[in-house]
């Protein structure tokens, strides 16, 4: 056999070996991905803030932020669209609104870092669109859609809820017309908002302020309008600092009552 023929045969075997290794690697990567795919679970509800979380076994570790301050950097928020989390259409009529203020809520449920925001949003919408009995026995009517306009996940990801063109819903005694409703996942009576959540809240609030000409003194919480503990003490006590940072960033010249 000539030297050229031997060289060609060696190259052929080398190519076959390389493709075999590549295929083997891809196969094991795919198998690994499939084995790590989470199982779908049922949804449940029973919370004062009218938020449903997906029922699943999760790591008990709470990713709580220990910072007492927001960082001083700003960027436009990245918002997961309704289409991206596969939202259903609203099931009824909703009240059109002109956005005048920002109102902050918490879900009043334990943070669930192992569940994707897409699944949480689908669960929230399922719960919102049916009548239910809430914690304490209070009845909730079926709403047309998710009650909040924006949902901030434990990792800081933001999802679009109800279209901000329409007023949100509440199970407490106040009129949410004109409010851009932002909810952060967690029970902030016992947990702390994560650093990522606080950064996303700040960026989202600034973006809304610019878009709708909202002043910093129009950024308040659920408990400022209704008899409720929402958004929990561990978030509520951070709001004065949030307003100041946003006011400074917007270049407001009045103190706005702070």
Give short role names for the model-derived ranges.
Residues 2-103, 107, 111, 142, ...:
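Basic/polar, cationic surfaces and motifs that engage anionic cell-wall
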Residues 131, 139-146, 154:
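Glycine-/small-residue-enriched capping loops at alpha/beta junctions
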């Amino acid at each position: 056999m000539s030297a050229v023929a031997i060289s060609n045969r060696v190259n052929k075997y080398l190519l076959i070996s390389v493709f075999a290794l590549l295929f083997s690697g891809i196969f094991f990567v795919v198998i690994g991905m499939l084995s790590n795919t989470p199982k779908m679970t049922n949804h449940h509800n029973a919370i004062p803030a009218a938020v449903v979380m997906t029922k699943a076994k999760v790591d008990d570790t709470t990713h709580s932020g220990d910072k007492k301050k927001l960082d001083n950097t700003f960027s436009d928020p990245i918002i997961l669209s309704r289409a991206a989390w596969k939202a259903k259409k609203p099931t009824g009529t909703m009240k059109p609104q002109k956005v005048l203020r920002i109102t902050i809520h918490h879900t009043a449920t334990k943070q669930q870092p192992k569940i994707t925001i897409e699944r949480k949003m689908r669960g929230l919408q399922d719960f919102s669109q049916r009548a239910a009995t809430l914690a304490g026995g209070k009845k909730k009517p079926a709403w047309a859609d998710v009650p909040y306009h924006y949902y901030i996940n434990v990792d800081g990801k933001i999802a679009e809820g109800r279209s901000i063109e329409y007023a949100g819903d509440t199970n407490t005694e106040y009129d949410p017309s004109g409010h851009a409703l932002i909810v952060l996942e967690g029970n902030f009576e016992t947990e702390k908002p994560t650093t990522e959540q606080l950064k996303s809240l700040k960026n989202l609030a600034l973006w809304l302020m610019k878009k709708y000409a909202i002043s910093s003194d129009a950024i308040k919480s659920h408990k400022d309008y209704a008899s409720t503990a929402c958004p929990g003490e561990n978030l509520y006590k951070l709001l004065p600092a949030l307003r100041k940072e946003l006011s400074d960033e917007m270049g407001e010249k009045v103190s706005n009552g702070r």
